[in-house]
Design a protein with these regions (language model features):
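Nucleic-acid substrate recognition interfaces
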Residues: 1-171
Length: 171
């Protein structure tokens, strides 16, 4: 069975601004990597996979401002989005009646209002704090959680509220 634990962070809390800034930086990385992939794809160089994109983006400012594991997760999400696009195009060519229109490439996030998900794997979290039942994402943002086998954690933005999500397995 899979369990999830949610905490709601409203825009009035001090933690909200820190998370919002990181999500904005996450969006910048997503858009920068998406631009590189789109240019490569459009101009005939082919698709750039996750490993190549990770190598290319390591020197990019948007990659450096986030923890490395978080940056890698963002690039993995983008890679998954592009692979889904290619699968949808294949399915569209086989039977276009299942679609309302031709599948579109992954879009850019909005330049000003856009935010992107922050995914913290178990490797990106302090193991000393984790043993105490505390998840310390970054300075001044800590959460106590229900003990269990923790898989992934992340922040998801929903209408001016940030929600930390924890996935626990085994209970």
């Amino acid at each position: 069975m899979q369990l999830a634990e949610r905490h709601i962070i409203k825009s009035t809390e001090h933690r909200f601004t820190q998370i919002d800034e990181l999500a904005f930086k996450s969006k910048n990385l997503y858009n920068a990597a998406n631009y590189v992939i789109r240019q490569s794809f459009v101009y005939g160089s082919g698709y750039i996979n996750y490993n190549e994109m990770n190598r290319l983006m390591k020197s990019h400012q948007a990659y450096k401002v986030l923890p490395a594991k978080v940056s890698q997760q963002i690039l993995m999400i983008l890679d998954k989005n592009w692979k889904s696009f290619f699968e949808a195009v294949k399915a569209y060519k086989v039977d276009s009646s299942k679609f309302t229109g031709r599948p579109k490439q992954p879009q850019y996030k909005d330049k000003v209002k856009g935010r992107n998900i922050l995914v913290y794997t178990i490797q990106a979290i302090s193991s000393k704090q984790l043993k105490k039942g505390i998840i310390a994402f970054f300075k001044k943002v800590r959460y106590e959680f229900w003990p269990g086998k923790l898989d992934n954690t992340g922040f998801m933005y929903t209408s001016s509220i940030w929600e930390p999500l924890y996935q626990a397995f085994g209970y």
